[in-house]
């Protein structure tokens, strides 16, 4: 019973994202790269561990899928710190684009239309994509041309650099258009 639970538990443990180091490396031979980048060729794992120990550094598996695996002698703590720092910087630089939605009805009043249009402009100014959906109820769906006219009014009202990702099209009982800010980098 204990063995069965242990096998199941082992499958659900999250894997460490860092490479194997020192005694965790299971290969018998490795392609060794020295601490200054010099190649030592294919060596026995024990010899590689001894070389790393003499340098007071760690043996880290850089490329585990290579045959034999590529290992480098380096300071593992420093390597982990720099890896986390690079990952943090990459996440910091990436822009998360959010898809906002604005819902309209075919018989919307002018004041409501202008308010929703202003809100769409704010979303676009913040760099978000906007999904504009027009909901038809009952027999309103017979007058799709009203929806087309409304979307034309929206396009005209959205002055400035915008990009229409998806032109107005029907999806079930609603007409959808997706716009995003046209940012030239």
UniProtKB/Swiss-Prot annotation:
Subcellular compartments: Cytoplasm
HAMAP family linked to this entry: IF_3
GO CC terms, sorted: cytosol; membrane
An example molecular function term from Gene Ontology annotations: ribosome binding
Family note: Belongs to the IF-3 family.
Record note on quaternary structure: Monomer.
SUPFAM superfamilies: Translation initiation factor IF3, C-terminal domain, Translation initiation factor IF3, N-terminal domain
Organism the protein comes from: Rickettsia felis (strain ATCC VR-1525 / URRWXCal2) (Rickettsia azadi)
Protein name: Translation initiation factor IF-3
């Amino acid at each position: 019973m204990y063995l069965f639970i242990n096998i199941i538990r082992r499958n659900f443990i999250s894997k460490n994202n860092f490479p194997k180091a020192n005694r965790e490396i299971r290969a018998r031979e490795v392609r060794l790269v020295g601490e200054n980048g010099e190649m030592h060729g294919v060596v026995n794992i024990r010899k590689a561990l001894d070389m790393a120990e003499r340098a007071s550094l760690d043996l880290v598996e850089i490329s585990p899928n290579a045959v034999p695996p590529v290992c480098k002698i380096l300071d593992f703590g420093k390597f982990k710190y720099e890896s986390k720092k690079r990952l943090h910087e990459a996440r910091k630089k990436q822009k998360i684009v959010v898809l906002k939605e604005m819902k309209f009805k075919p018989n919307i009043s002018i004041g409501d239309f202008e308010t929703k249009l202003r809100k769409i402009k704010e979303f676009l100014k913040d760099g978000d994509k906007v999904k504009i959906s027009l909901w038809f109820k009952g027999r309103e769906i017979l007058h799709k041309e009203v929806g087309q006219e409304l979307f034309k009014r929206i396009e005209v009202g959205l002055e400035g650099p915008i990009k229409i990702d998806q032109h107005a099209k029907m999806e079930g009982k609603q007409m959808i258009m997706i716009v995003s800010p046209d940012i030239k980098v």
